[in-house]
UniProtKB/Swiss-Prot annotation:
Protein name according to UniProt: Large ribosomal subunit protein bL34
InterPro entries to which the protein is assigned, alphabetical: Ribosomal_bL34, Ribosomal_bL34_CS
GO biological process: translation
Assigned protein family: Belongs to the bacterial ribosomal protein bL34 family.
Keywords recorded for this protein, A-Z: Ribonucleoprotein, Ribosomal protein
Any one GO cellular component localisation term in the record: ribonucleoprotein complex
Gene designation: rpmH
Amino acid sequence: MKRTYQPKNRRHKRVHGFLERMSSTSGRNVLKRRRLKGRKKLSA
């Protein structure tokens, strides 16, 4: 059986990237929370 997770860089960026996060209010909230938490990486 084929495994379910077949990583693709393009999809990873398009779905979880910084610009994608900035494009919606909830995405901006994600970034805000990660900044407050002190994450080194804010997004993929």
